[in-house]
Amino acid sequence: METIPIAGAEIYYERNFLPAAEATSLFNILLTKCVWQRHRSSFKYAVPRDEAYYGDPGTNYTYSRREYKPLTWIPELLSLRTRVEGATPTIAYSNLGLKPRGYNAVLCNLYRNGNDSVGLHADAEPEMGPVIASVSLGAERLFRIKGKTGAVAFAERLPHGSLFIMAGNTQKNFKHEVPKEPDVALPRINLTFRHIEHQGIPTDKFGDF
């Protein structure tokens, strides 16, 4: 597990978290098995990606006036959750004075091609917890982190089967995005594991899409 040296952030990165064949098998399963939906934002336009939210009972939360209610875990996501928990460095919690608590929800994003994206944002909702782990499957897409001044702190196409963990004050000090890349024709799935802290108590945050 590599540590990305960015002042004010705490980031762990494993480029080869899943073997290629296993990552491809999981990608194909989730592509057809997840209950994908293309939601509309509070401003009535379609969010430019498909989403599926799975989690323990009570892990609902609200983002941009849209409530996410968890679907029941499917076996493949439960199995992956256990592996991601095992790979998450305990120091990610101890640096914050916390005991390891694992993940109780996952937001799955499907980018069907390079026209799908997620705008610059921070996962800074108080109920989301400070440690967020992301598994990438499928087409490599640019993942970019920017500081408060807009300066790029990290920019890399995350590989198929990679694990990227943001912890510490990363969400407070930085925003991240997956910009549009019209030349990308193939789909990408991103699985973002979280620990919902205040279960069942939604917030009302506006986000970029």
Label for each model-derived stretch:
Residues 1-209:
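Non-heme Fe(II) oxygenase metal-center motifs and adjacent flexible, charged/small-residue loops
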